[in-house]
Amino acid sequence: MFRALTIAREYGSGGGSIANRISQMLGWTLLDKALILEVARAANVDPELARRYDECIDSWLHRVGRRALWRGALEGVAAVTEADFFDAETMTALTRDLILQAHERGKCVIVGRGGQCVLQHRADVFHVFVYAPWSDRIQRARGRLPAGADVEEFVRSNDRQRTEYVRLHFGCNWSDPHLYHMLVSSELGEETAASIIIDAMERGPKDRA
């Protein structure tokens, strides 16, 4: 049995919900939005600021000079000086450390945040990419956005952002199938997809080819 699972997902694919089901079925820790709070606590910044930098590159917040000081640091990460500011790179560095620590503890499901890249050479980690038909993704996204929003452009933009985030911070191609043990369509149903992933983890080889 693998000791950790990473789930990368297209926006609106239901990958987060599938990850949640798996964590409940296995009794494992789910690291998704909770990572944002852990980063904020480690950096001693407002969780809302950490949320805005989650899975993104430096945005308009950085360009207009948002100056939120990083006043704390995780053990093993050098503390910053008064001249340093919390930004996307800081967010990613702290997230990477939290992912590595979670892997050491084991029994965790890591959603997004480049987990498949951070842990790609660990033989005891199972990597999954969740995708969905375009129509399903649009339907899910429509339920999250305000009326009148350009849903299709929002989803495309989100895909571009995640692709660029993984490329810039981890040097990986987010959509490269070679990063994953399994690609799963949520069209199968979230419960079925979760069960298939767990079964593959339990039956599959412990070492990656």
Regions found by a protein language model. Give the residues of each.
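RNA pseudouridine synthases
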Residues: 102, 108, 114-121, 142
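Short beta-strand-centered segment that lines the nucleotide-binding/catalytic pocket of NTP-utilizing
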Residues: 29-41
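Glycine-rich phosphate-binding P-loop
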Residues: 6-23
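Conserved phosphate-donor/acceptor-positioning beta-strand/loop module used by diverse small-molecule
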Residues: 121-159
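Small-molecule kinase domains that catalyze NTP-dependent phosphoryl transfer to phosphate-bearing small molecules
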Residues: 57-65, 70, 148-191
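ATP-dependent small-molecule kinase phosphotransfer cores
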Residues: 40-107
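NTP-dependent small-molecule kinase module
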Residues: 96-100, 171-209
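Pre-Walker A (Motif I) flank of P-loop NTPase domains
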Residues: 1-5, 106
